[in-house]
Structure formats: structure tokens, C-alpha cells
């Protein structure tokens, strides 16, 4: 690679030579100019996150950072980290969904109306929607692991208190609020960890794998609840079980999870800790990071950490996000791509939670099902949620890869990922409408579950794609971006769970879910507007 010398006394730490320059924002999201000799046969022109970089600092000789991988962790270590975040990602939705099959029982136990007992779901979802804004802001600056430890520890304590709560509805609602605050961290923290470890070209399926945890909540929670509620006096063990599984997650985090936030640990290579721009030591020797040494070790990285080095190259490769403020969230919330995708996702969640909350009630009253049968019926939409996320995530990455092969010198339009959501929204609309009329006319339970499954499939198909899109769009604020999206969708879920019983009474079940289905045409419109205006809105620095 030919180079040009830099003779100025003050210049950017990354001088430009006469080699071809590639902007790394396409596949890396790290704000740095990388120099690439495209004649080098070892360089994959479609894989710009692992490049041979040549960096010139002021007047000093060139230092070589060879083939820096996106992540320094081995496949086994990445799999282990994914296992931990998937498991802990399961805990939040588990806490919310294990409660739902018990609503008819708890209504009798606490001697309250259906609307009042549904309020315990509403306050949980409302808190679950707002709290990630707090966790996400800290996670993008202070680190992932310490927030996992704090939030899961709080989950353990609150579940102990819930298991012994007196039969007073006020106490139950209060503790559910605290439970929601603690458990709301796991999705934004997990999504941030996934983005730390996986490059954008693999981000869709990586997010799909992570979402196995959150999506398993709606599948396993009703079954677990049904088994626990075989004896109606055992409803307190719902929270005892949550305490046990949360404690297991906390142990895994403390013992095995490393810090992954890129502005603190970079790509996880331990060599960064002992490396800096030292001309006396490095003027004649290239610095080779192609054989990284991962920072993974037992019981490590506990606490709020500083960057492992103050070196300017490290800071250029792995920049800190701008200082957080309330205005940061307001700017993110009002950024058109974020608000449009969040509205689309929120309306889908509104419809899904209306189905989820009413299904147990209708199965008990209209079909005379036992608690165990009710729990088993939730398996169908739960499995469909898994399938929607996995198929959508893998297909999204496959379409991206095909596009890059044909346009390898062109930056991939991130909004192209959202094309897939059109199919998901249409499936969700059909599922909602079919579910309502099947209940209205008391059709066979298989028809009810098929339409509920279609709604669940369409929801996660869209949700996975939107999360992947946001993680690429706001690469320095991944947890915050996911938190904003979660805020909108969980607020919508809270409102729907609070009002759905009265809406069904006033409108009739069929017309109620017809309206909920058709309102998702707004979701479809939002996505189409974003795709058609993809060049209009330029990503700002958040």
C-alpha cells in the first residue's frame, strides 16, 4: 500500500494516504476512516468491519493495526455470553406473563373486579415501558454488566416480597411496579450486548437469537403458571419461582459475563490495555491485533468502569457517545425514523397484548378450560413468536448479504431491512380480526389459536427487524434506542390491557378486534413512509 507522508505539526490522528478510503459506517458503525488496499487478495470487499488498517499519527512512522476483528471473543465465549443474555432476557417477559393466567384466580383471592385485577398488568406494563429509558441511558455510558447485577438483584428481592404479600390489592400493585422497574432492564441491556459482539452484517440473526429469551417468556410462563396453579392455593409460588430463576441469572452474570460496552473495552481484546501511541516502543514494529486475547475471565468487570486505555486510536475506533441528557432522549424520540418505527411497533404490541390478556379470560369463561389447559393454549402463539423472530432475522440478513454482493461499493440503505415488516403487519392484521370473530361465534379452539398465532408471528417478525434497524441506525446509543422503542410499545400494551375488557363489552368481541386489527394500517403506513423517504433524514450524532 502506497502512502504519503504527513508533514504538518497538527493534524487528525488518522491521516489520509493515496490509497482507497472507505467510510466504516457501513458495516462497522465506528466513526473512523479506514484505508484499504483493494488489491490485497486477503481483503473481502464485502466485509468492511475486518480490514487491514494503516494509521499515521502526526509526524511519527506508520503503525499497523492489522485485521482488527469486530469481536475478540472466541466462538465459545460469544456463545456463552449469548446464553447468559438470552436467559436473562427471558426473565423480564417471564415476570410479566407468568402472572396473566392467574388473573381469574387472583380476582377472587383479592376480591376485586376484572378491571381492577387487569390494572396490575397495566401498571406493570406502564412501568416496564418507562424504566428502560433509565437503564438504557446508563448502559450506553457506564457499562452493561453492573446494571445487570443491580437490576437482577432487585428482582430477587422484590419477588421475595411478592411471594409474601398480604391480600391487599394496593400492596400487590405497588410491588408489581417495583418488579417491572427491575425486570425492564434486560431487553435493552441484552440488545446492547448483542450489538457489542456482532457486526451489522450478522445483526439480524443475532438479534433473533437474543430474542429467543424474551419470546420464550410468553411460551413457558403460562405453562409454568398452569403447573403451579394446579393447586389454587399455590399462587404465591409464582413469585417464589421467579425469585429462584432470577437468582440463577444473577449468579451467571457475576461469575461469567464480561463487560462488553465497546467504548469501554473496545472489541474485548486484552492487548488494548497495555498499548498506547508510544513511538519509542512501536516505531519499528507493527502492532498486530489479528490474534486477539479476549478479556474474558471469572468474576471480572464488576463496577462502573473507565475505558481500558486513553489512547486516541482506541477512542477513534470505539468512541464514547455524547454526554447524556434528557434532551438526548427527546431528540431520539423526535427523530423521524425512530418515531415512525416506534409507532408501528407500539400498535402491533397493543393488539397482541389485547389478545394475550383476554385469551385466559375467554378460555375460562367461554370454553370452561382449567388453569393447566389455559397455560397450554398459550404455547401456540408463543411458538409462533419464536418462529417469526427467527425466520425474520435470518431472512433480513440474507437479503442484506444479497444486496451487498450486487452493490459492494455502495452503503447499504438501512431502511431496506424494513421492507420485510410489510408482510408481518399484514399477518398481524389478519390474526387480530380472525381471533375476535372466532371468539365471538365460539368457533373451535384450534381456529382461535391459529389466528392468535398469526398475530404473534407477525409481531415478532416486525419487532426483530425494527430492533436490528435501530441498532444500526444509532450505533452509539443502541440501548437507548431500544429503550425508546420499548417505551412506546409497552405504553401501548399497558393501555390496551387496561381498556380491552371494557372495549369488548361495549363494542362486542368481534368488532373490537376488527378495530384493533385495522389500526395497524397506521403501522404499515409508517413503515412505507420511512422506506420511501430513506434519503430525507440524515442520522444525527446522538
Curated annotation (Swiss-Prot):
PROSITE patterns: MFS (PS50850). GO terms for cellular component: cell periphery; plasma membrane; prospore membrane. One of its GO terms (molecular function) is amine transmembrane transporter activity. Pfam families: MFS_1 (PF07690). SUPFAM superfamilies: MFS general substrate transporter. It is found in: Cell membrane. It is a multi-pass membrane protein. Glycans are attached at residues 6, 46, 111, 118, 274, 463. One of its GO terms (biological process) is ascospore wall assembly. Coiled coil: none annotated. Disruption phenotype: Leads to intracellular accumulation of acetate and decreases the ability to kill Galleria mellonella larvae by decreasing proliferation in the host hemolymph after infection. It comes from the Eukaryota. Keywords: Cell membrane, Glycoprotein, Membrane, Transmembrane, Transmembrane helix, Transport, Virulence. InterPro entries: MFS, MFS_dom, MFS_trans_sf. The chain crosses the membrane at residues 80-100, 119-139, 146-166, 169-189, 210-230, 237-257, 332-352, 374-394, 419-439, 441-461, 481-501, 511-531. Induction: Expression is up-regulated during internalization in hemocytes and in the presence of hydrogen peroxide stress, but surprisingly, down-regulated upon exposure to acetic acid. The keyword Protein biosynthesis does not apply. Plasma membrane acetic acid exporter, relieving the stress induced upon cells within hemocytes, and thus enabling increased proliferation and virulence against Galleria mellonella larvae. Confers resistance to weak acid and oxidative stress, but not to antifungal drugs. Belongs to the major facilitator superfamily. CAR1 family. This is Multidrug transporter DTR1. It comes from Candida glabrata (strain ATCC 2001 / BCRC 20586 / JCM 3761 / NBRC 0622 / NRRL Y-65 / CBS 138).
Amino acid at each position: 500500500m502506497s502512502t504519503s507522508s504527513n508533514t504538518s505539526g497538527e493534524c487528525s490522528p488518522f491521516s489520509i494516504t493515496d490509497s482507497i478510503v472507505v467510510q466504516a459506517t457501513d458495516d462497522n458503525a465506528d466513526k473512523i476512516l479506514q484505508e484499504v488496499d483493494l488489491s490485497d487478495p486477503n481483503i473481502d470487499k464485502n466485509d468492511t468491519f475486518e480490514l487491514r488498517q494503516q494509521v499515521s499519527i502526526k509526524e511519527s512512522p506508520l503503525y499497523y493495526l492489522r485485521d482488527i476483528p469486530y469481536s475478540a471473543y472466541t466462538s465459545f465465549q460469544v456463545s456463552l455470553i449469548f446464553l447468559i443474555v438470552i436467559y436473562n432476557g427471558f426473565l423480564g417477559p417471564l415476570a410479566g406473563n407468568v402472572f396473566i393466567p392467574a388473573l381469574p384466580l387472583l380476582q377472587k383471592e383479592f376480591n376485586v373486579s376484572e378491571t381492577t385485577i387487569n390494572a396490575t398488568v397495566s401498571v406493570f406494563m406502564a412501568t416496564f415501558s418507562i424504566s428502560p429509558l433509565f437503564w438504557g441511558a446508563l448502559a450506553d455510558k457506564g457499562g452493561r454488566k453492573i446494571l445487570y447485577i443491580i437490576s437482577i438483584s432487585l428482582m430477587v428481592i422484590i419477588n421475595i416480597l411478592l411471594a409474601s404479600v398480604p391480600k391487599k390489592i394496593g400492596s400487590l400493585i405497588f410491588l408489581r411496579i417495583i418488579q417491572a422497574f427491575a425486570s425492564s432492564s434486560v431487553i435493552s441491556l441484552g440488545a446492547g450486548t448483542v450489538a457489542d459482539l456482532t457486526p451489522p452484517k450478522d445483526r439480524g440473526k443475532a438479534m433473533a437469537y437474543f430474542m429467543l429469551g424474551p419470546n420464550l417468556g410468553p411460551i413457558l410462563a403460562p405453562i409454568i403458571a398452569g403447573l403451579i396453579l394446579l393447586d389454587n392455593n399455590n399462587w404465591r409460588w409464582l413469585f417464589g419461582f421467579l425469585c429462584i430463576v432470577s437468582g440463577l441469572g444473577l449468579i451467571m452474570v457475576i461469575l461469567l459475563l464480561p463487560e462488553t460496552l465497546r467504548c469501554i473495552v473496545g472489541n474485548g481484546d486484552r492487548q488494548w490495555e497495555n498499548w498506547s501511541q508510544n513511538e519509542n516502543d512501536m516505531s519499528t514494529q507493527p502492532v498486530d491485533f489479528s490474534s486477539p486475547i479476549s478479556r474474558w475471565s471469572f468474576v471480572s468487570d464488576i463496577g462502573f468502569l473507565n475505558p481500558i486505555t486513553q489512547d486516541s486510536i482506541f477512542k477513534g475506533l470505539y468512541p464514547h457517545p455524547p454526554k447524556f441528557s434528557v434532551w438526548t432522549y427527546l431528540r431520539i424520540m423526535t427523530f423521524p425514523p425512530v418515531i415512525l418505527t416506534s409507532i408501528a411497533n407500539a400498535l402491533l404490541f397493543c393488539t397482541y397484548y389485547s389478545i394475550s390478556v383476554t385469551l385466559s379470560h375467554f378460555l375460562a369463561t367461554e370454553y370452561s378450560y382449567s388453569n393447566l389447559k389455559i397455560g397450554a393454549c398459550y404455547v401456540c402463539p408463543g411458538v409462533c413468536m419464536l418462529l417469526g423472530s427467527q425466520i425474520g432475522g435470518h431472512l433480513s440478513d440474507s437479503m442484506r448479504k444479497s444486496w451487498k454482493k450486487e452493490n459492494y461499493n455502495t452503503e447499504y440503505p438501512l431502511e431496506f431491512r424494513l421492507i420485510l415488516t410489510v408482510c408481518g403487519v399484514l399477518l398481524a392484521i389478519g390474526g387480530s380480526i380472525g381471533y375476535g370473530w372466532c371468539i365471538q361465534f365460539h368457533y373451535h379452539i384450534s381456529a382461535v389459536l391459529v389466528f392468535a398465532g398469526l398475530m404473534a408471528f407477525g409481531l415478532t417478525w416486525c419487532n426483530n427487524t425494527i430492533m436490528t434497524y435501530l441498532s444500526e441506525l444509532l450505533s452509539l446509543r443502541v440501548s437507548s434506542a431500544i429503550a425508546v422503542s420499548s417505551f412506546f410499545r409497552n405504553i401501548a400494551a399497558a393501555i390496551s390491557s387496561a381498556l380491552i375488557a371494557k372495549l369488548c363489552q361495549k363494542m362486542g368481541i368481534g368488532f373490537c378486534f376488527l378495530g384493533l386489527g385495522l389500526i395497524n394500517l397506521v403501522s404499515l403506513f409508517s413503515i412505507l413512509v420511512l422506506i420511501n423517504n430513506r434519503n430525507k433524514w440524515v442520522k444525527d450524532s446522538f
